[in-house]
Design a protein with these regions (language model features):
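Short, conserved non-catalytic motifs in the polymerase core
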Residues: 26-36, 61-87, 104-118
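Intrinsically disordered or highly flexible coil/loop and linker segments, enriched in small
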Residues: 13, 22, 26, 58-59, ...
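Reverse-transcriptase-like RNA-dependent polymerase core
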Residues: 9-18, 52-73, 87, 94, ...
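Non-catalytic, well-ordered alpha-helical scaffold segments
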Residues: 1, 14, 33, 47, ...
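Non-catalytic, polymerase-adjacent accessory regions of viral genome-replication enzymes
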Residues: 1-47
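Generic detection of long, well-ordered alpha-helical segments
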Residues: 6-10, 32-43, 82-89, 117-121, ...
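Active-site-proximal segment of RNA-dependent polymerases
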Residues: 1-7, 95-152
Length: 155
């Protein structure tokens, strides 16, 4: 089974939905459809997404842009996709995580972002461990607006 078939399967999309449905039920994209509203007709919507993915007719919608306040009067731009797009994105993420599992495991201790079970706490613990072993340099990298620059059409 190829990657597109795995991602577009009803089972994969249901799994993706199960991981999304718990979060911020009032969050919405440009159309205003919330997770709670999607949930009311989720089976039909998942079947429709699956069919359109398999037929090659699925189109990502434009994102809703918002500014999240940060400290010192600064703002962080955020792009919020439609709920259906989030289901597809999550299905892709689940499949890619499985596909690259071995590579991700090899990078443990080097990268802590966007990996299940890793976060700031684990990064700080690893930095302390490296310091105790004589290392004295840390590289911190942040790709500004990475997700905003991903070409959705090429996905």
């Amino acid at each position: 089974m190829n990657l597109l078939n795995k991602i577009s399967s009803v089972e994969s999309l249901r799994l993706a939905w199960a991981k999304l449905e718990k979060f911020n039920k009032e969050s919405h994209g440009l159309t205003g459809e919330t997770i709670a509203e999607f949930e009311l007709n989720k089976e039909d919507k998942i079947l429709s997404i699956s069919k359109r993915l398999q037929e090659g007719t699925y189109q990502f919608s434009p994102y809703r842009a918002v500014l999240i306040p940060k400290s010192k009067g600064k703002f962080r731009p955020l792009q919020i996709p439609e709920v259906s797009d989030r289901v597809v994105i999550k299905a892709i993420a689940i499949e890619l995580e499985e596909h690259f599992k071995e590579l991700l495991e090899k990078s443990r201790g080097l990268s802590f972002a966007y990996q299940k079970g890793l976060g700031v706490k684990e990064a700080v613990e690893k930095i302390n461990e490296y310091c105790q072993n004589g290392y004295s340099y840390v590289l911190e990298a942040d790709l500004i607006n990475f997700f905003g620059t991903v070409d959705k059409d090429s996905l």
